[in-house]
């Protein structure tokens, strides 16, 4: 293998290739299909943001377009912020970004219990003037990229079948994941903890950690999860409401879930029609947030659900395609991880609103209201698009 090929495989580029005027821009075009899918999901999310939020926005903000305008504003800002990275960023620069993002997210998670804003009895947000961010969301991206960097750097040691393989392939990645999980748990963010844990295990598995260690960790995590539920009163309350939904207080802890199920059940095959939801009139609380999927079901019916789920499925398939053809292992693991993150959050949100799992307060990517979350989601897709420019597939 010549020096140039070796540098490409390691995600490192020579000074000549970095600074040459002819190569100033990233070398190829972005993956067009992935870009179109992201645009389609975002447009769908924009439309449903207005439809689901109009009544609530009129009641509390005297402006039915309040959340819609926020969505458009943050979407435009996200695109403007992300576009330069897509065009200019090179794989070795994303490696530097991974280290910085992991350090920043760890620091922010440490600050949440101290200066975080409390909503619903939990501290998950930090405000910087008019903008609020959820550090656990940044931590998910940071963990994916940092583990991708680590697993690609120590690939040979991870592949060892002895103690070295356990130390480099299991112990250290587990510590990196576990630290963020513990810090997230301090903010009473169970869904964030679950996703961070699953992302960590996913990257470890794809990155080459032995299956026996993965299975052992899954067993330990399951035991730890049961213990947490027994120890934490708020977690136990949600689990008991989920198990005994028919006996739970329909005007109290079970209200949101039951009203969401009513919305889903009333949609039928074709739905009531866009904008014609009944449940958004104060029945489903803040319908533009975590339970926006129920409004999609009610207004667009089963056909609308198939379209939404189909778009997310296409995004996952195309994301995996980009990951498979990425220029090096770091880029590949990063694309796999960021794609899996979207898939996990989508599946968990749908599972919550359909009462297949306890209500954990998890948003539907690209649909649920939240400016900083939307900007981060667009940026994540931008990372994948940036890497797609270096695809090994000839175009």
What does each of the following model-derived ranges do?
Residues 22-38:
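N-terminal membrane topogenic signal
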Residues 42, 49-54, 191, 277, ...:
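Short linear Ser/Thr-Pro motifs
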Residues 47, 118, 123, 267-269, ...:
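Gly/Ser/Thr-rich beta-alpha loop segments that engage phosphate groups in nucleotides
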Residues 245-289, 293, 300-304:
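TM-adjacent membrane-interface loops and short helices in multi-pass inner/ER membrane proteins
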Residues 129-139, 186-188, 268-273, 362-376:
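Glycine/serine-rich anion-binding loops at beta->alpha junctions
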Residues 39-43, 51, 58-256, 294-355, ...:
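Hydrophobic alpha-helical transmembrane segments of multi-pass inner membrane proteins, especially
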Residues 1-25, 347-395:
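A juxtamembrane structural motif centered on a specific transmembrane helix
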């Amino acid at each position: 293998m010549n020096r140039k090929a070796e540098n490409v495989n390691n995600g490192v580029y020579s000074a000549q290739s970095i600074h040459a005027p002819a190569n100033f821009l990233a070398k190829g075009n972005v993956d067009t299909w992935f870009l179109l899918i992201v645009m389609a999901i975002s447009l769908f999310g924009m439309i449903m943001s207005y439809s689901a939020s109009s009544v609530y926005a009129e009641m509390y903000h005297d402006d039915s377009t309040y959340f819609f305008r926020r969505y458009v504003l943050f979407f435009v800002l996200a695109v403007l912020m992300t576009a330069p990275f897509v065009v200019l960023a090179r794989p070795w620069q994303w490696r530097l970004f991974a280290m910085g993002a992991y350090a920043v997210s760890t620091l922010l998670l440490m600050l949440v219990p101290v200066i975080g804003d409390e909503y619903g009895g939990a501290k998950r947000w930090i405000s910087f003037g008019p903008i609020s961010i959820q550090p656990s969301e940044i931590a998910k991206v940071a963990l994916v990229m940092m583990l991708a960097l680590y697993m690609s750097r120590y690939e040979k040691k991870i592949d060892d079948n002895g103690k070295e393989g356990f130390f480099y392939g299991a112990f250290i990645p587990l510590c990196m994941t576990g630290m963020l999980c513990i810090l997230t748990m301090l903010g009473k963010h169970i869904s964030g903890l679950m996703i961070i844990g699953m992302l960590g295990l996913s990257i470890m598995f794809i990155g080459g950690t032995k299956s026996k260690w993965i299975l052992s960790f899954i067993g330990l995590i399951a035991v730890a999860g049961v213990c947490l539920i027994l120890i934490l009163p708020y977690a136990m309350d949600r689990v008991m409401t989920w198990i005994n939904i028919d006996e739970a207080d329909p005007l109290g802890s079970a209200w949101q879930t039951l009203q969401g199920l009513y919305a889903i059940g009333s949609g039928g095959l074709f739905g009531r029609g866009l904008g014609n939801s009944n449940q958004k009139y104060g029945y489903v609380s803040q319908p533009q947030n975590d339970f926006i999927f129920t409004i999609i079901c009610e207004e667009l019916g089963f056909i609308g659900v198939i379209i939404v789920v189909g778009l997310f499925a296409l995004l996952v398939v195309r994301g995996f395609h980009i990951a498979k053809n990425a220029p090096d292992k770091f880029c590949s693991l990063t694309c796999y991880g960021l794609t899996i993150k979207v898939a996990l959050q989508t599946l968990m949100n749908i599972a919550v609103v359909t009462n297949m799992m306890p209500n954990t307060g998890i948003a539907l990517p690209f649909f649920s209201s939240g400016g900083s979350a939307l900007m981060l989601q667009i940026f994540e897709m931008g990372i994948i698009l940036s890497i797609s420019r270096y695809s090994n597939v000839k175009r």
